[in-house]
């Protein structure tokens, strides 16, 4: 006969709730907990990504509204608990070791546990700030044990989920002429140019296409005049299929009856998906915790968390460039050898646009 044995391990689990800790079997509020093992086992570069799939009821989305970014290198991932709470959105109240700060500044390797308070009971402690839920992040501390040194490293790759499929230059030319016909205008692309485009797509290395020389006047190359020279997929040209990311973390932890300490050092590198230009993110984290028990009733805690992010990418708003690529004609060549004035920003040649517009470093 089969017998069911009671498993009380989860019932005895200690959960951080508001200003205190409680056993799970005494909690009546809706609380979800994520332990450090579930976070460090995933090759993520930020804490928000580590929550995905670990907590039910969380909805994630790239921050594409505030500053125009969405999915680019270093973009913050926004999330809400059980859906949007108001017409203006609203975000959960995030506390790291009792101090309000962004989850982007926390190294996932330093996390001890995360508690997500989902219902209105959190407002009893945090007031109106808890209207959209509360996320309590607890970082690792020293323990009464011999000094222990731990290293964790990971390597992974990022890939675009979905890239637009551009039409060929021949399709573009025919649709452009159909547009002109519907508007009662003459064709933008001549039949002779379309014949050259067909020949170029069949054999781009034919002697019929000698190439393009430098345009000394600097007035650019019109797509209609040189459409026979290219059949360019601009998304394939400017974006990579995959980008590498890796992280390295080392920590030392220990203590005695009177003192305890924890020191964590972290480095994260994330390569961007843009090609032909520098597009990457580097993050440095230092987390230190020291605890000294002077007497039975007096204890000193010294906590310090320092985060430095170095983001290098072309243009201040990368989404604008993404939209520019979508509007580029596939009949343009990838590199137009045009002499450009020192202080002029070419809007028709995106490669020069990237080079001349400068970089944004934060």
Model-derived regions, located:
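A general secondary-structure junction signal
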Residues: 64, 155, 306-312
């Amino acid at each position: 006969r089969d017998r069911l044995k009671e498993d009380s391990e989860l019932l005895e689990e200690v959960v951080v709730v508001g200003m205190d800790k409680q056993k799970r079997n005494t909690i009546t509020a809706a609380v979800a907990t994520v332990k450090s093992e579930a976070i460090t086992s995933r090759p993520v570069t930020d804490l928000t990504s580590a929550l995905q799939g670990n907590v039910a009821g969380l909805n994630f989305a790239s921050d594409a509204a505030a500053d125009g970014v969405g999915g680019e290198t270093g973009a913050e991932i926004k999330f809400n608990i059980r859906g949007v709470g108001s017409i203006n959105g609203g975000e959960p109240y995030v506390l790291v070791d009792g101090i309000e700060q962004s989850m982007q500044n926390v190294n996932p390797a330093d996390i001890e546990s995360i508690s997500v308070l989902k219902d209105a009971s959190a407002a009893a402690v945090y007031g109106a700030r808890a209207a959209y839920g509360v996320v309590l992040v607890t970082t690792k501390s020293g323990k009464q044990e011999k000094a222990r040194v731990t290293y964790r490293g990971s390597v992974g790759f990022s890939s675009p989920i979905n890239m637009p499929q551009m039409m060929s230059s021949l399709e573009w030319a025919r649709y452009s002429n159909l547009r002109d016909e519907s508007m009662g205008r003459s064709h933008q692309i001549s039949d002779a140019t379309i014949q050259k485009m067909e020949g170029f797509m069949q054999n781009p290395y034919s002697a019929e296409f000698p190439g393009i020389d430098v345009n000394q006047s600097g007035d650019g190359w019109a797509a209609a005049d040189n459409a026979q020279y290219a059949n360019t997929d601009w998304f394939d040209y400017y974006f990579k299929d995959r980008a590498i990311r890796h992280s390295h973390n080392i920590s030392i932890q220990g203590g005695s009856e009177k003192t305890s300490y924890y020191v964590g050092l972290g480095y994260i590198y994330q390569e961007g998906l843009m090609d032909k230009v520098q597009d990457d993110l580097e993050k440095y984290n230092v987390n230190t915790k020291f605890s000294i028990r002077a007497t039975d009733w007096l204890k000193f805690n010294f906590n310090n968390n320092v985060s430095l992010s170095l983001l290098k990418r072309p243009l201040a708003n990368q989404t604008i460039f993404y939209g520019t690529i979508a509007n580029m004609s596939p009949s343009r060549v990838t590199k137009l050898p045009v002499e450009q004035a020192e202080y002029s920003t070419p809007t028709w040649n995106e490669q020069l646009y990237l080079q001349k517009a400068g970089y944004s470093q934060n």
